[in-house]
Amino acid sequence: MHNETSKRKIPIFPEITSSKDLIAYLDSSERLNKRKYLYHYTTIRNAIAIFKSGTWHLGNPRDMNDVVEYRNGDQQRWNNIFFASFMAENKESIAMWSMYSQPWKDGVKIAIPMSTMKEWLKGIDEILEVSPTNYELTGKSIPVNERNTIHISSVAYSNTASCDSSGDSETLMWSNQKNTKIPNCQQLSELTGYIKDNAWDYEKEVRLKAEFENTFGYSRVAVKIPNSILNEITISSGPLFEGDLLQRMEYELNRSFHTDQSFFAG
């Protein structure tokens, strides 16, 4: 499905007029060609869990912090979408530290080279069910194929909510580009999972998505992340991280790591 759209000639972002072309544009790996890394802001506890389990969990949108996006999306489509969020912006973000790496004393940032991310995606062959109560694997899974997909997609940002009161024209934004040719984009069911309000545009979000017909009623899933990929990850301590990051990680996992620290650390 996503490979087919990537082969079509896609208009430049300002000239896109259809949901189909917008989805193809945001799903295209070309959007990330200039990005060296994708970043995931989290806590040391979650980072350790990823390394211990050799899996990366993808949550259901019902549990995300943007209730406006969930409300605007199609509820049936949401049932079939799971994702983990990354930031495509190389510049370090205090806003992201504040939102996702709390408490401050435990905040870390995971950096995955873009080439490593693409290699990881190619090797994922199944989607694993995760228990919503204890977050452990249930032993159930579905294969990755044309119907059950794993891919990365960018998020576009809309000013629909704010333009109603300000009188501005409705505008969709991705990176530094603007589009005014897809009206009411946040209300289009087929764009569920692709559009957020521009209040969130500082996140420069890229999503690792699993999409499938959720006939089994999965509420949380995971994908395997092998050691060859984990070995390429760099973990940075946050601005107010307490203790020695490398010592804390090695104590828990008994392995070596690539580590760094926040630009804003004292």
Language-model-detected regions and their locations in the chain:
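NAD-dependent ADP-ribosyltransferases
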Residues: 1-266
